[in-house]
Every structure is written in C-alpha cells, then in structure tokens.
C-alpha cells in the first residue's frame, strides 16, 4: 500500500513542478488552477519526495505527519 500524501490547495501556486516530476501522481485542476493528487500509487516514494522538495511553497505533505 502506497503512503498517502496530499496537496494543500490553499498554499498551491500552480507552478506545476509536481506534475512535471510525477505526472502519474499529480495533475492540475483547470477550474481552480491548483495541483491535486490524482493517484497515490502513480509515483514512487522517491518521486513524491522529489516533488515535495521541489515545490516552492512546500504544499505537498504526507497524510500521516
């Protein structure tokens, strides 16, 4: 079972870095212009961690932290 994570959409600035790094896990919502998690199993933990580290506003978080 994949470790769950989420995007804090209040903080997201729609830079799309997470989508570029892990397109299987993240997508952009065109209506609100924010990133969201489309599939928690769509990327490896390493890819998710890279997306977290690359996010300029640090709005991607593990659900259990």
UniProtKB/Swiss-Prot annotation:
SUPFAM superfamilies: 4Fe-4S ferredoxins. The keyword Metal-binding applies. [4Fe-4S] cluster binds at residues 12, 15, 18, 55. It holds the Pfam family Fer4_13. PROSITE patterns: 4FE4S_FER_2. Keywords: 4Fe-4S, Electron transport, Iron, Iron-sulfur, Metal-binding, Transport. One of its GO terms (molecular function) is iron ion binding. The keyword Electron transport applies. PANTHER family: FERREDOXIN (PTHR39163:SF1). Ferredoxins are iron-sulfur proteins that transfer electrons in a wide variety of metabolic reactions. Homodimer. This is Ferredoxin-1.
